Swiss-Prot record:
GO CC entries: cytoplasm
Gene Ontology terms: biological process: AMP salvage
CDD domains from the UniProt entry: ADK
Ranges where the record places region NMP: 30-59
SUPFAM superfamilies referenced in this protein's UniProt entry, alphabetically: P-loop containing nucleoside triphosphate hydrolases
Catalysed conversion reaction: AMP + ATP = 2 ADP
Binding site for AMP: 31, 36, 57-59, 85-88, 92, 160, 171
Function according to Swiss-Prot or TrEMBL: Catalyzes the reversible transfer of the terminal phosphate group between ATP and AMP. Plays an important role in cellular energy homeostasis and in adenine nucleotide metabolism.
Species of origin: Brevibacillus brevis (strain 47 / JCM 6285 / NBRC 100599)
Protein name: Adenylate kinase
Subunit architecture: Monomer.
Length: 214
């Protein structure tokens, strides 16, 4: 079972990825992990990727695809895989389709965990941290007893720069613009399945499981 998992920041993709790979006994393959492993193992493609990254340049698609191909060729992918964070563009998606085909396989499912923009903003801007003890709170999921104050030591909670609404909104809008062409691409291939990510975590996973077993 070969799966691509899509979802914007805050959609709960990481949580569902963990559950899927455990349920179906397939490896969770993220681009970050792939790159780190290739660089650490000093594979020719890993070293080539590192030379671009060291200069602050984007790694060319052909190198990225080469690293993906190496990873998908490993023994632990024999029963399938879950790809997370790749592809990011339509050319990468086309190259991935060709690569998987060359390996005698195909992409079976593309799952998009769908959450409305306003809900994502609320999720992503809800984290507040205590400067004294480092405790983390969330206004939606784990609020302090008194707003803005740490339960443990009374420290005044603060918000990281990355969690502020201006930064979150900009990051989300960039992601939405990048993701839409991929959604269109996989929709046209009749591979894409939208899952409502605004439901309870257990319900989201139950729907994904039902889809994959169907």
């Amino acid at each position: 079972m070969n799966i691509i998992l899509m979802g914007l920041p805050g959609a709960g993709k990481g949580t569902q990825a963990e559950r899927i790979v455990k349920e179906f006994d397939i490896p969770h393959i993220s681009t970050g992990d792939m790159f780190r492993a290739a660089v650490k193992n000093e594979t020719p493609l890993g070293l080539e990727a590192k030379s671009y990254m060291d200069k602050g340049h984007l790694v060319p698609d052909e190198v990225v695809i080469g690293i993906v191909r190496e990873r998908l060729s490993m023994d632990d992918c024999a029963k399938g895989f879950l790809l997370d964070g790749f592809p990011r563009t339509v050319p990468q998606a086309e190259a991935l389709t060709a690569t998987v085909k060359e390996l005698g396989r195909e992409i079976d499912h593309v799952i998009n965990i769908n959450v409305q923009r306003e809900q994502l903003i609320e999720r992503l801007t809800g984290r507040w941290i205590c400067p004294v003890c480092g405790a983390s709170y969330h206004t939606m999921f784990n609020p302090p007893k008194e707003a803005g104050v740490c339960d443990k030591d009374g420290g005044k909670l603060y918000q990281r720069e990355d969690d502020k609404i201006e930064v979150v909104t900009q990051r989300l809008d960039v992601n939405i613009a990048q993701t839409q062409p991929l959604i269109d691409y996989y929709s046209a291939q009749e591979l894409l399945r939208d899952i409502d990510g605004e439901q309870d975590i257990q319900v989201v996973f139950a729907e994904i499981k039902s889809l994959l077993r169907g």
